[in-house]
């Protein structure tokens, strides 16, 4: 079996995983809740901007962090939005675990751009 075959198997396993199926179900429900969907989209947009700022080396903006925390507190009051956020987080954790497993498996030789 080739690496590509294994990758296809992994894709199939992910697509059929409980975490991904829960994510899809939560997304379907969110798609039917326009106010909840707008809140989630705004939250993710602002969260992504804050993460990009941190990756660019900028210090954490406490005001933006507090705004995100307040937005999250409002989102969790909407069960549909809350369920989507939680399902998204669970699936993202699965994806992160897989990326780590793959990264660890091929770490040797990948230090070309590492710090010297």
Descriptions of predicted regions:
Residues 1-116:
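Terminal, compositionally biased segments used for targeting/anchoring and flexible tails
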């Amino acid at each position: 079996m080739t690496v590509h075959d294994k990758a296809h198997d992994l894709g199939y396993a992910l697509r059929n995983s409980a975490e991904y199926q829960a994510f899809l179900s939560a997304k379907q429900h969110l798609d039917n809740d326009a106010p909840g969907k707008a809140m989630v989209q705004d939250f993710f947009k602002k969260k992504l901007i804050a993460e990009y700022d941190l990756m660019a080396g900028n210090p954490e903006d406490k005001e933006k962090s507090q705004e995100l925390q307040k937005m999250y507190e409002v989102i969790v009051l909407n069960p549909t939005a809350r369920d989507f956020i939680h399902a998204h987080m669970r699936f993202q954790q699965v994806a992160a675990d897989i990326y780590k497993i793959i990264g660890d498996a091929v770490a040797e030789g990948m230090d070309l751009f590492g710090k010297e």
